[in-house]
Design a protein with these regions (language model features):
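Conserved beta-strand-loop-beta-strand hairpin that lines the nucleotide-binding pocket
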Residues: 1-2, 49-131
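Helix-loop-beta hinge of the Bergerat
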Residues: 1-31
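Conserved short strand/loop->alpha-helix "switch" segment adjacent to the catalytic nucleotide/phosphoryl-transfer site
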Residues: 20-42, 97-99
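Conserved polar catalytic motif of the HATPase_c/GHKL fold
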Residues: 43, 47
């Protein structure tokens, strides 16, 4: 499945539901779909729209879904310049606990089984395994 999502934060929910509704039964448990997948994908899309594409309506976020026998892999790529994930501040550090932002990737990493980034830093790959 491939999907181009307009850079409009109002479209995130519809895009997440479209992806979740197209997963074959039994690919992931209902709980993993209803919470882990939906939450992680919504966060990744929101970051791509807000930070990658700067909410520019002329840009889109590309979503590609790969289905395996026991996994779902979701690629999310924006049109932005990318960023170095190693330079993100640790959201659990005492100096960062009261920040209003900066927890998105931390949350994603705890919801999915594997997270990978493309070399440019404008694409994220989320892998959820059955079980």
């Amino acid at each position: 499945m491939k999907l181009d999502v307009p850079s409009d934060l109002g479209m995130v929910g519809d895009a997440v539901e479209l992806v979740a509704s197209h997963l074959p039964p039994g690919t992931l448990s209902p709980r993993r779909i209803s919470f882990n997948l939906r939450t992680a994908l919504a966060e990744a899309l929101g970051n791509a729209i807000r930070y990658g594409n700067g909410e520019d309506p002329e840009r889109v976020v590309q979503v590609r879904v790969e289905l395996g026998r026991d996994f779902v892999r979701i690629h999310v790529m924006d049109d932005g310049l990318g960023f170095d994930t190693g330079r993100l501040p640790d959201p659990t550090h005492p100096d960062n606990l009261e920040r209003e932002y900066g927890r998105g990737l931390f949350v994603i990493r705890h919801l999915v089984d594997d997270v990978a980034f493309n070399e440019k830093g404008n694409g994220i790959c989320l892998t959820l395994r059955a079980g």
